[in-house]
């Protein structure tokens, strides 16, 4: 095999795989380097114990927080990346998310592109990723989005009751857009069966729309695309001028490998992409590759999250509860009294007894929790997630220790709107459940985060912008400092917004792909 390719992509997650898929029809030779292996298809894929208690598929890497405490990030290094384990919520950023927005805790900066630049790619990504939803329900929609190609996923009985409860309170709950291969009109032939093992699990049926099933696997037989798993990129080398990347150096079980490409794209995840650039410091890039702005690794975001766990006196009739969301408070409280953004509410996945044990394992070892008790509690739980925007701060950053380890310095910020929304949600559940408890990420140490979420929505670190002094990438996601380096994972985000970033990552990779196609024509 030749060691030179037209395009070398580091990472096979939503960004890297979507870019490869976009570029494959050009006939250009494409190499995808993935640190993980192919995920085994096995019974444990759907085992709550294996997934949440034994952490069978999660990385064993250790990162270190600002106090030097080690913790295991909620990351999965497999072909297809983290989307193999995500909850399949696929939402567009709102139009105002691309603009400068004043929050209670500071300013969320404007993006160098508008919603209009991504809109056609959002349309395409929603079709490709088979997003099920219903236009016209979400009060924050622009109103010009095309109808979803797939109908909204139906609500379980208890979720339908909750929807009515909120509507009676004047709220406007809507169907959460989900990427699943579901055909409810033909349940006996539908790939998706609306099971209890979706979010947090790999799908044994290949029914979840993720990078592995929709982007990577269709490329495996494409002759000009080569996927090499088990290759961790550890350094990028440049020519003597420092303007062009010449080599991607990988660490494998067999030793070091070196690959060259005319264009190099990094899509290793916000933390690992920043770490790779910092580890690639050289005489021409003494502070790290593409880091003349001193912004590589900075502005790390991962949303402010609170799980609201509600306990009912009666058994709650749910199998697939994650179908409902609320955006009434996204940009402020419609009741008045607070005109700053608060965030987004969505129902969470079904939580079995062993899932519950895994979620509390940082505080109470599973061996001390009787299985029957955990199961009985889980049958009466209804869980929701409040997502709010954290702001990009220079001091919230990824940096490397002397031994190359990843250090994550992070201080929670912009909490007022989030806490108001949590309190509003808990109050709204009065009369529907017996009691509600908020488990807030920002009240925990970084090494004791909710395991299901943790660092799952990592963003920023290599943000794009028009000014090389304050950004790492240009508006096409090419590094300001280099001629042939692009980044297409969530590193490029300027702000976090308050929704899952996957759909935006896919749409942007398509946009950058079209730009690269035009570049290669020249």
Model-derived features: positions:
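Extreme N-terminal leader/targeting segments of oxidoreductases
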Residues: 1-7, 25-26, 518-522
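FAD cofactor-binding and catalytic pocket of flavoenzymes
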Residues: 67-74, 92, 111-115, 293-412, ...
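A glycine-rich dinucleotide-binding beta-alpha-beta segment and adjacent secondary-structure elements
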Residues: 174-176, 194-195, 234-237, 380-388, ...
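Glycine-rich loop(s) and the adjacent beta-strand/alpha-helix scaffold that form part
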Residues: 25, 29, 36-41, 46, ...
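Redox-cofactor-proximal catalytic regions of oxidoreductases
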Residues: 51-139, 332, 387-389, 394
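N-terminal Rossmann-like FAD-binding beta1-loop-alpha1 element of flavoenzymes
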Residues: 7-32
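A conserved FAD-binding loop/helix module that cradles the flavin
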Residues: 495-513
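Conserved redox-cofactor binding core of oxidoreductases
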Residues: 102-233, 449, 454
């Amino acid at each position: 095999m030749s060691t030179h390719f037209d395009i070398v992509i580091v990472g096979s997650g939503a960004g890297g795989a979507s870019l490869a898929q976009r570029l494959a029809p050009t006939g250009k030779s494409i190499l995808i380097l993935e640190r993980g292996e192919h995920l085994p298809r096995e019974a444990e894929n759907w085992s709550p114990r294996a997934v949440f208690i034994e952490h069978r598929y999660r990385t064993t890497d250790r990162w270190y927080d600002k106090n030097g405490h080690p913790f295991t990030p909620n990351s999965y290094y497999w072909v297809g990346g983290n989307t193999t384990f995500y909850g399949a919520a696929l939402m567009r950023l709102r139009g105002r998310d691309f603009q400068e927005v004043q929050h209670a805790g500071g300013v969320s900066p404007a993006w160098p592109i508008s919603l209009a630049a991504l809109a056609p790619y959002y349309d395409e990504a929603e079709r490709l990723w088979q997003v099920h939803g219903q236009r016209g329900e979400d009060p924050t929609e622009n109103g010009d989005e095309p109808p979803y190609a797939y109908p909204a996923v139906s609500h379980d009985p208890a979720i339908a009751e909750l929807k009515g409860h909120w509507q009676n309170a004047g709220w406007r709950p809507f169907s959460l857009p989900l990427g699943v291969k579901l055909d409810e009109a033909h349940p006996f032939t539908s790939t998706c069966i609306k099971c209890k093992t979706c979010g947090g699990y790999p799908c044994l049926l290949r029914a979840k729309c993720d990078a592995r099933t929709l982007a990577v696997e269709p490329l495996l037989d494409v002759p000009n695309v080569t996927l090499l798993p088990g290759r961790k990129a550890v350094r990028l080398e440049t020519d003597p001028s420092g303007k062009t990347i010449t080599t991607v150096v990988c660490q494998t079980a067999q030793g070091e490998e070196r690959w060259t490409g005319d264009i190099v794209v990094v899509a290793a995840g916000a933390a690992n992409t920043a770490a790779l650039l910092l580890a690639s410091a050289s005489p021409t890039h003494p502070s790290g590759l593409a880091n003349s702005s001193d912004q590589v690794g900075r502005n790390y975001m991962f949303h402010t999250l609170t799980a609201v766990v509600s306990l009912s006196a009666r058994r709650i009739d749910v199998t697939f509860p994650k179908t409902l969301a609320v955006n009434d408070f996204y940009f402020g409280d419609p009741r008045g009294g607070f005109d700053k953004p608060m965030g987004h509410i969505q129902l969470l996945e079904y939580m079995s007894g062993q899932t519950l044990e895994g979620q509390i394992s940082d505080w109470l070892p599973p061996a001390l929790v009787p299985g029957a008790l955990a199961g009985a509690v889980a049958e009466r739980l209804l869980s929701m997630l409040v997502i709010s925007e954290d702001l990009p701060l220079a001091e919230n950053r990824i940096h490397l220790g002397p031994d190359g380890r990843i250090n994550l310095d992070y201080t929670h910020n912009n909490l007022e709107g989030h806490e108001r929304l949590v309190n509003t949600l808990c109050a709204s559940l009065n009369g529907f459940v017996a009691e509600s408890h908020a488990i807030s990420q920002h009240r925990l140490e970084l090494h004791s985060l909710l395991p299901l979420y943790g660092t799952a929505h990592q963003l920023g670190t290599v943000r794009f912008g028009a000014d090389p002094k304050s950004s790492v990438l240009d508006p096409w996601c090419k590094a300001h400092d280099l001629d042939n380096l692009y980044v297409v994972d969530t590193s490029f985000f300027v702000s976090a917004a308050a929704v899952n970033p996957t759909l935006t990552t896919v749409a942007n990779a398509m946009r950058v792909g079209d730009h690269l196609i035009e570049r290669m024509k020249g």
